[in-house]
């Protein structure tokens, strides 16, 4: 299957018109035979891509003390408890942050306050923070999340996720696609039988089907 994925990725990149910006490569997945009105059937998975996403991933860490100091070297923003409370009083700023940031990480001790101040904003977006336990290394956690994508169907049968960038090697992108397909097959109730079709495409290019 790896060769067929690589062929599809290569075609998608080769057939894409030349643009004056760096395009991403996305995977579109069409599901079937699932009642997505039932939340238990929806896809909501974090997947670490072996070749990386090909783009910068925006990450915010909620932390204090030594953890906050270490996070400053790797995270895009580090927010304290006081700044969290300020966001809780400013819905517009909180919504802007939630829309701009890909992933949030928080010390476990701050999760209750995050739920209180930002739960209604982050929750529906599927962006509640990953809890950071006392023994967890914040640098390792953030570095891992730099190569992570969230695959989320919500109630839709068709959903998309980023699998790379146009200037990445086709085989690297294919490795990313393969990891996502394997995760989907392991997660879905009927495995591959719940996948109707899959396509890869650049941001502005044509869709190329990935053979089953």
Curated annotation (Swiss-Prot):
<dbReference type="GO" id="GO:0003735">
    <property type="term" value="F:structural constituent of ribosome"/>
</dbReference>
<keyword id="KW-0678">Repressor</keyword>
<dbReference type="GO" id="GO:0000049">
    <property type="term" value="F:tRNA binding"/>
</dbReference>
<keyword id="KW-0689">Ribosomal protein</keyword>
<dbReference type="InterPro" id="IPR023673">
    <property type="entry name" value="Ribosomal_uL1_CS"/>
</dbReference>
<keyword id="KW-0820">tRNA-binding</keyword>
<keyword id="KW-0810">Translation regulation</keyword>
<dbReference type="InterPro" id="IPR002143">
    <property type="entry name" value="Ribosomal_uL1"/>
</dbReference>
<dbReference type="Pfam" id="PF00687">
    <property type="entry name" value="Ribosomal_L1"/>
</dbReference>
<comment type="subunit">
    <text>Part of the 50S ribosomal subunit.</text>
</comment>
<dbReference type="GO" id="GO:0015934">
    <property type="term" value="C:large ribosomal subunit"/>
</dbReference>
<protein>
    <recommendedName>
        <fullName>Large ribosomal subunit protein uL1</fullName>
    </recommendedName>
</protein>
<dbReference type="InterPro" id="IPR023674">
    <property type="entry name" value="Ribosomal_uL1-like"/>
</dbReference>
<comment type="function">
    <text>Protein L1 is also a translational repressor protein, it controls the translation of its operon by binding to its mRNA.</text>
</comment>
<keyword id="KW-0694">RNA-binding</keyword>
<dbReference type="GO" id="GO:0006417">
    <property type="term" value="P:regulation of translation"/>
</dbReference>
<dbReference type="InterPro" id="IPR028364">
    <property type="entry name" value="Ribosomal_uL1/biogenesis"/>
</dbReference>
<dbReference type="InterPro" id="IPR016095">
    <property type="entry name" value="Ribosomal_uL1_3-a/b-sand"/>
</dbReference>
<dbReference type="InterPro" id="IPR023669">
    <property type="entry name" value="Ribosomal_uL1_arc"/>
</dbReference>
<dbReference type="GO" id="GO:0006412">
    <property type="term" value="P:translation"/>
</dbReference>
<keyword id="KW-0699">rRNA-binding</keyword>
<dbReference type="GO" id="GO:0019843">
    <property type="term" value="F:rRNA binding"/>
</dbReference>
<comment type="similarity">
    <text>Belongs to the universal ribosomal protein uL1 family.</text>
</comment>
<keyword id="KW-0687">Ribonucleoprotein</keyword>
<comment type="function">
    <text>Binds directly to 23S rRNA. Probably involved in E site tRNA release.</text>
</comment>
């Amino acid at each position: 299957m790896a060769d067929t994925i690589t062929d599809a990725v290569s075609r998608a990149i080769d057939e894409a018109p030349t643009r004056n910006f760096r395009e991403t490569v996305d995977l579109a997945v069409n599901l079937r035979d699932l009642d997505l009105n039932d939340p238990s059937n929806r896809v909501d998975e974090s997947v670490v891509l072996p070749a990386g996403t090909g783009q910068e991933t925006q990450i915010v860490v909620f932390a204090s003390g030594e953890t906050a100091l270490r996070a400053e070297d790797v995270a895009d923003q580090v927010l304290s408890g006081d700044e969290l409370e300020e966001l809780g009083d400013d819905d517009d700023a909180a919504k802007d942050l939630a829309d701009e940031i890909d992933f949030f990480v928080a010390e476990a001790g701050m999760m209750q306050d995050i739920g209180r101040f930002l739960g209604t904003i982050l929750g529906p977006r599927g962006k509640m923070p990953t809890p950071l336990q006392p023994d967890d290394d914040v640098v390792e956690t953030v570095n891992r999340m730099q190569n992570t994508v969230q695959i989320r169907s919500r109630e839709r049968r068709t959903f998309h996720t980023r699998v790379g960038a146009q200037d990445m090697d086709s085989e690297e992108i294919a490795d990313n696609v393969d990891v996502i397909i394997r995760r989907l097959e392991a997660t879905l109730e009927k495995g591959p039988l719940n996948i109707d079709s899959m396509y890869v495409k650049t941001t502005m290019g044509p869709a190329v089907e990935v053979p089953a």
